[in-house]
Regions:
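Small-residue (G/A/S/T)-rich helix-start motifs and N-terminal tracts that mark the onset
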Residues: 1-72, 170, 181-343, 351-368, ...
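Nucleotide and nucleotide-moiety/phosphate-recognizing core
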Residues: 27-118, 126-148, 331
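Short acidic-hydrophobic sequence patches enriched in Asp/Glu that either
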Residues: 76-79, 130, 164-167, 271, ...
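Short acidic loop-to-helix transition motifs that present clustered carboxylates
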Residues: 99-102, 152-156, 179, 349-352
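Glycine-rich phosphate-binding loop
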Residues: 102-104, 109-126, 314-323, 401, ...
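A short, aliphatic-rich alpha-helical micro-motif
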Residues: 108-112, 165, 310-311, 336
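Internal gly/pro-rich beta-alpha loop/helix module
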Residues: 112-113, 118-120, 124-212
């Protein structure tokens, strides 16, 4: 973001104008959350984040807010000094901390809204003693807290939190999301994150090393093309799903049903013959390819049949509840290297490719991987903690290195093709259940089978999957909802 701001300045913008736009956007966001005519305390640091805070104070005065500013030192930058002087001319009260600690704490105690404008995206390490003290007091208040850009105390690039940190209800950031908004533990301190424009053009944003957007921004208002009245089932493609094993029939059922709900013209379920009666009894609209098996897992002796079916289909899902052994590895590798249709690898499809990860680059068709953090750790040979600490970097680098689309699941699922990084904001904690991933894989596979660009299919699938989960949570609750309930709430 710092490089992007400099590029904007090099192309005619000024830092003072960017600060004015940032502060105005943040103030208007706070008004949207009910701050008009309320008591607002703004805590300003010494740098440009504090400068944003002074602008916020001026703008809020126009909305009849009772504004007080707590200053953690004198402004040090030219633009921050200028905006502090403007705020003083409007008779906005200034309290210095820690010099007048008692007054500052009394203001915080009585505030309806508090703005954290102490540190911005350049912060590293831990808060100093005075800032940590005021952050701790703010966190005990009942006020609505808004952070400017990122909560003070979090590391912007790595999401680290070292000691006390402001905890926000709302974070207003500018132009693009930052890693701290999607990484742990910093994400838990951001509350809801909104991205505001400061007038930097899309052309300049696109010059960035990579673009970080939300899925809804990327997709736009129209998720899918209209279904023409002259269409037939062939128009919407055939999905081959190689899924299920003994004890995991449910994965096949959820994947298949979700694919049907997501619009595929035909869904062909290839599965061990022993579980065929169970799955067929639940998916009466699907067609089936029973497979030879060993110990309840599909046997590699049907590899040629599966490769042929894959190439006759429009997309392939591999792995949901499939099991993992040498046979599944052979099935996955044969389809990966011989199929010319989009392939979605999930669950045991991912586990089966781990020993043969070099084959991803040899795939003849677009490949989408949908790992959860544990599967991502196996792909990389690292720990889950390392994945969670570096989600953005890992998603980008893995997708770029292996020429795939990667869906790194979790709260704020990430999707990347190696050039763009998308953050999904739909979904809820009620979706953290076995089976949710099977539903997602079926949805993405269904969209790809309908001829939608595979990367867009992944993005659209993740977004719609989260929306379905949100509808289900509203209809039932996060505690009681199940993945099978979510399937009934899929809508495009």
């Amino acid at each position: 973001m710092r490089d992007l701001e400099q590029t904007a300045v090099d192309n005619g913008a000024t830092y003072i104008k960017l600060m004015e736009k940032a502060g105005t956007a943040a103030a208007e966001a706070l008004i949207k959350y009910g701050a008009e005519s309320k008591k607002v305390v703004i805590i300003c640091g010494k740098g440009n984040n504090g400068g944003d805070g002074y602008v916020i104070g001026r703008v809020l005065k126009k909305y009849n807010c009772k504004v007080d500013i707590i200053r953690l030192g004198e402004p040090r930058t030219t633009d921050s000094k200028l905006n502090a002087e403007k705020a003083i001319k409007l008779d906005i009260a200034m309290v210095n901390f820690p010099e007048d600690k008692e007054t500052a704490f009394e203001l915080i105690k009585n505030a309806d809204y508090i703005v954290d404008a102490v540190y911005g995206i350049g912060f590293r390490g831990a808060l100093d003693e005075n800032t940590a003290e005021i952050a701790k007091f703010v966190n005990t208040s009942k006020a609505f807290v808004m952070a400017v850009d990122i909560p003070s105390g979090v590391g912007c690039d790595d999401g680290s939190v070292k000691g006390e940190c402001f905890k926000a209800n709302l974070t207003v950031t500018f132009t693009t999301l930052k890693p701290a908004h999607i990484l742990y533990p910093s994400m838990d301190y951001c509350g809801k994150t909104e991205v505001a424009s400061v007038g930097i053009s899309d052309e300049l944003i696109n010059l960035s090393e990579y673009i970080m957007q939300t899925t809804d921004e990327f997709l736009g208002e129209k998720l899918l093309p209209e279904r023409k009245i002259s269409s037939n089932k062939g128009t919407f493609g055939t999905l081959l799903a190689v899924v299920g094993s003994y004890g995991m029939a449910g994965a096949a059922i959820m994947c298949g049903k979700a694919a049907q709900r997501s619009g595929a013209g035909l869904v062909n379920i290839a599965l061990p013959k022993s579980i065929y009666p169970i799955v067929a009894g639940k998916l009466i609209e699907a067609v089936f390819t029973p497979l030879a098996e060993k110990n309840g897992i599909s046997s590699a002796e049907d590899c040629n049949k599966l490769v042929s079916l894959a190439n006759k289909s429009n997309a392939v899902v591999l792995g949901c509840g499939m099991g993992h052994n040498e046979d599944t590895e052979k099935i996955v590798c044969e389809i990966l290297t011989n199929c010319k249709k989009p392939i979605i690898l999930d669950a045991d499809g991912i586990n089966s490719i781990v020993p043969h990860i070099h084959l991803l680059k040899k795939a003849k068709a677009p490949v989408i991987l949908t790992p959860h953090p544990g599967e991502m750790a196996r792909l990389l040979g690292c720990t889950v903690a390392e994945v969670q600490q570096n989600r953005a970097e890992i998603a980008l680098n893995f997708a770029k290195e292996h020429n795939v689309s990667l869906v790194l699941k979790g709260a704020n699922t990430l999707i990347s093709d190696g050039n763009i990084l998308l953050v999904n904001r739909t979904g809820n904690a009620g979706m953290a259940r076995g089976g949710s991933g099977d539903v997602l894989a079926g949805m993405i596979g269904s969209l790809a089978a309908q001829g939608i660009n595979p990367f867009r299919a992944a993005v659209c699938g993740v977004y719609a999957h989260g929306l379905a989960g949100d509808r289900t949570a509203k209809r039932l609750s996060e505690t009681t909802m199940l993945p099978t309930d979510m399937i009934e709430d899929i809508s495009f």
